[in-house]
């Protein structure tokens, strides 16, 4: 003690249970349960990082080792204790990828190392089966009960009426029944043919699509021309009939019907002039002489101004088919110019005594599926005191009236399905598929796979066909690329053994690396191995060249495809260019992937199926929410047979398309009850894998990705063009753009996609490593030449 300096040191040794130093701050007590705010406050308090912690926290020495002010900490602990006593259902669910301190950001980012646009560049991989809006008003229809089978409303008549009984030429009637295999006339043919043969009065024909309107006005013209015996009608006699139609495809189809009819009388010569073809060739055909001319309004007006060999002085019939579509495309002024030119140059009075069996004045015929205001305006311009013939499938109305008589017209409208609407065929089954936006692509794939399986299971040798309608050509091109990946193209090659040309499948290698490739250089017919071994996809829209459109349509119409591996299931991706008037054989199904822009467009689309008494089905894709009201607001009115309007579940469609064949059998054999919490089976894994393959393909191929972005933006623009009367169902402001972009295989945010398309840097900043290739001067010259040729055509490119 003597050596002691008098100082006494008091050391407070910490207990072994208490953490020391920074370890205490880092490890701390793990806090679980309760509100996030309370958990955060408690965690910070335990780490010594609370608000005003230095001022409020006073550490005592000696026996008192607790904080003086612990009121906030105690309140936080009490709130946690009460939260733990609440039932599990009321607890807030925390995603597995988050720690207990809460999310680090507003959205969860997933890193993708295999793709160019993955990882940090605003790329998000969302699940297909989460955050999907459920259907609120429409419930799936129970199809287990027996359904009523309705008789076809547009089938040929099965009574004693025949083509001979309608007053047609015996030779022509025999050709129809024996060579062309027409058994009996349809309702509209029974009403129109006698009227055109017996009278010279202008005519307005209203009938549903697929009812045989084309033959109803072609047969009387042929009958009259064939009946001239004293002065036989030849190509030198002149032009006697002009048929105006809105689209080139319908022109080609009517011309094909004319070619089959002239086989019984070779002296009559048909002709065709349409936009996209060479004017020089058309002028040569007109110079040789034609008796019946099928044309589009723009090209016909062009020839009337510039082709002197086109003589319309002897014109006896002017037929306007699809009058409602002619007015929608803005051809009123062109048609007025055509009719004025015909009236100005008419010289019928000079040949009345020569052709005594032909009309003494021009007969105008207007065919339309509806009597809308614009159609009435067109009728008032070209028709003179016309007779109206209408065939209503619902009330069996077959009558005539004065077109200009408002009182008679109003009475007719009230009896004839409100006069302004046509109806779907009675035998057509209309299905409504309400599918969330993220699942649109996989739902379409599942439906096409199902149809391919059904077609392949049938060994009757009949080629089934399906039509899928899109709202714009950009979306069509993207989906065509998706479903024809790794597909083969068809080429004709000479067989060395037989010395004949055969159609064979050749692997098609996509040229996406060449950014200067023109759309016309790519094939419009490819096989679809991802849908089935015997599936083939065609594309048809107005941006293709006329040669491609004609070749594609002709290949699709063929009864049997040539080649060893002929496609049994043919699928046509098209816009509304193929919705009017085209008579395509064996169309078993019509899929409206994008909603129509009007009810009339819907009826024309589904009218490609269930034609002339045949069975058919149609599927309309709708989004949950406001679009469901479109069924009761617009669709149900034009489908009078309620049993044939059915709501189907998208889960059932996905199961049928992606489920393995053994799964259904295992579920039936299983004796145990299924787990109610397990909503999905293996089919959802297959669907997710299929969709992820599409996304990875877009990440690996920059040009394909750009086409997907263009398709997405074009789809949104097309969606915004719905009629104002239907804006309550199709409101672009209510779309979930992020989920909709998912259906195009895109992982970027819609805002970033909009910047890339709008001309800003956008995605280009992400892909700085790739340099844009300079266009080859030779290819640029050829492309500019093609643009110049196309610009010379005055035909509306629809």
From Swiss-Prot:
Q: Which GO terms describe its molecular function?
A: ATP binding; ATP hydrolysis activity; RNA binding; RNA helicase activity
Q: Which GO terms describe its biological process?
A: endonucleolytic cleavage in ITS1 upstream of 5.8S rRNA from tricistronic rRNA transcript (SSU-rRNA, 5.8S rRNA, LSU-rRNA)
Q: What is this protein called?
A: ATP-dependent RNA helicase DBP7
Kindly indicate whether the keyword Nucleus belongs to this entry.
yes
Renumbered to this chain, the Basic and acidic residues biased-composition regions fall at 69-93, 666-678
Q: Where does ATP bind?
A: 207-214
Keywords attached to this Swiss-Prot or TrEMBL record, sorted alphabetically, are:
ATP-binding, Helicase, Hydrolase, Nucleotide-binding, Nucleus, Ribosome biogenesis, RNA-binding, rRNA processing
UniProt xrefs under Pfam families: CTE_SPB4 (PF13959), DEAD (PF00270), Helicase_C (PF00271)
Q: Out of the domains of life, which is the source?
A: Eukaryota
């Amino acid at each position: 003690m003597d050596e002691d300096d008098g100082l006494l040191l008091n050391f407070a040794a910490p207990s072994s249970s208490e953490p020391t130093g920074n370890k205490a701050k880092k490890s701390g007590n793990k806090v679980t349960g309760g509100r996030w705010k309370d958990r955060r406050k408690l965690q910070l308090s335990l780490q010594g990082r609370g608000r005003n912690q230095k001022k409020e926290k006073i550490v005592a020495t000696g026996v008192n080792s607790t904080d003086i002010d612990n009121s906030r900490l105690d309140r936080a602990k009490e709130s946690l204790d009460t939260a733990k006593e609440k039932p599990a259902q009321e607890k807030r669910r925390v995603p597995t990828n988050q720690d207990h301190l809460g999310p680090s950001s507003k959205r969860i980012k997933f890193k993708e190392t295999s793709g160019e646009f993955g990882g940090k560049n605003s790329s998000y991989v969302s699940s297909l089966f989460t955050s999907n809006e459920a259907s609120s008003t429409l419930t799936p229809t129970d199809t287990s009960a027996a359904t009523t089978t309705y008789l076809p409303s547009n089938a040929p008549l099965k009574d004693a009426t025949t083509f001979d009984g309608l007053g047609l030429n015996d030779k022509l009637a025999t050709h129809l029944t024996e060579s062309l295999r027409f058994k009996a006339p349809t309702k509209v043919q029974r009403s129109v043919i006698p009227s055109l043969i017996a009278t010279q009065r202008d005519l307005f024909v209203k009938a549903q699509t697929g009812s045989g309107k084309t033959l109803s006005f072609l047969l009387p013209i042929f009958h009259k021309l064939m009946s001239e015996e004293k002065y036989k009608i030849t190509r030198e006699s002149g032009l006697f009939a002009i048929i105006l139609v809105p689209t080139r495809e319908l022109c080609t189809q009517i011309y094909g019907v004319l070619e089959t009819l002239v086989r019984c009388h070779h002296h009559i010569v048909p002709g065709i002039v349409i936009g996209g073809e060479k004017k020089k060739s058309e002028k040569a055909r007109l110079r040789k002489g034609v008796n019946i001319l099928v044309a589009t309004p723009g090209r016909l007006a062009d020839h009337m101004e510039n082709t002197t060999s086109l003589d319309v002085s002897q014109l006896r019939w002017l037929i306007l088919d699809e009058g409602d579509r002619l007015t929608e495309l803005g051809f009123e002024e062109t048609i007025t110019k055509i009719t004025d030119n015909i009236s100005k140059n008419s010289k019928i009075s000079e040949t009345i005594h020569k052709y005594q069996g032909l009309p003494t004045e021009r007969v105008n015929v207007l065919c339309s599926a509806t009597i809308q205001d614009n159609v009435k305006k067109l009728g008032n311009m070209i028709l003179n005191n016309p007779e109206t013939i209408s065939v209503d499938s619902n009330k069996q109305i077959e009558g005539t009236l004065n077109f200009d008589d408002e009182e008679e017209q109003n009475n007719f409208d009230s009896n004839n399905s409100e006069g302004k609407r046509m109806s779907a065929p009675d035998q057509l089954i209309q299905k409504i598929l309400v599918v969330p936006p993220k699942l649109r692509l996989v739902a379409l794939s599942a439906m096409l796979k199902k149809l391919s399986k059904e077609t392949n299971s049938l060994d009757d040798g009949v080629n089934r066909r399906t039509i899928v309608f899109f709202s714009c050509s950009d979306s069509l091109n993207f989906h065509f690329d998706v479903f024809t990946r790794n597909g083969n193209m068809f080429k004709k090659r000479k067989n060395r053994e037989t010395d004949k040309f055969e159609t064979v499948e050749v692997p098609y290698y996509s040229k996406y690396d060449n950014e200067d490739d023109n759309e016309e250089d790519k094939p419009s017919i490819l096989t679809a191995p991802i849908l089935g071994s015997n599936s083939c996809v065609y594309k048809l829209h107005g941006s293709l060249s006329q040669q491609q459109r004609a070749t594609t349509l002709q290949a699709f119409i063929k009864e049997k495809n040539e080649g060893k591996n002929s496609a049994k299931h043919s699928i046509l991706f098209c816009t509304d260019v193929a919705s009017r008037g085209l008579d395509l054989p064996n169309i078993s199904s019509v899929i409206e992937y994008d909603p129509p822009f009007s009810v009339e467009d819907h009826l024309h689309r589904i009218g490609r199926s269930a034609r002339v008494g045949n069975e058919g089905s149609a599927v309309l894709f709708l989004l949950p929410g406001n679009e469901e009201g479109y069924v009761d607001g617009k669709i149900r009115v034009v489908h009078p047979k309620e049993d044939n309007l059915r709501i189907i579940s998208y889960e059932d469609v996905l199961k049928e398309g992606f489920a393995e064949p053994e799964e259904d059998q295992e579920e039936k054999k299983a004796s145990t009850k299924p787990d109610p919490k397990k909503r999905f089976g293996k089919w959802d894994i297959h669907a997710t894998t299929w969709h992820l393959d599409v996304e990875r393909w877009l990440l690996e191929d920059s040009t394909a990705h750009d086409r997907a972005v263009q398709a997405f933006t074009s789809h949104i623009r097309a969606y915004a063009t719905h009629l104002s009367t239907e804006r309550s169902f199709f409101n672009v402001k209510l779309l979930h753009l992020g989920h909709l972009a998912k259906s195009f295989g895109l992982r970027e945010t819609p805002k970033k996609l909009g910047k890339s398309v709008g001309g800003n840097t956008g995605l280009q900043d992400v892909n700085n490593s790739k340099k844009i290739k300079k266009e080859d001067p030779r290819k640029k010259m050829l492309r500019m030449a093609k643009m110049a040729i196309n610009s010379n055509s005055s035909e509306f490119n629809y």
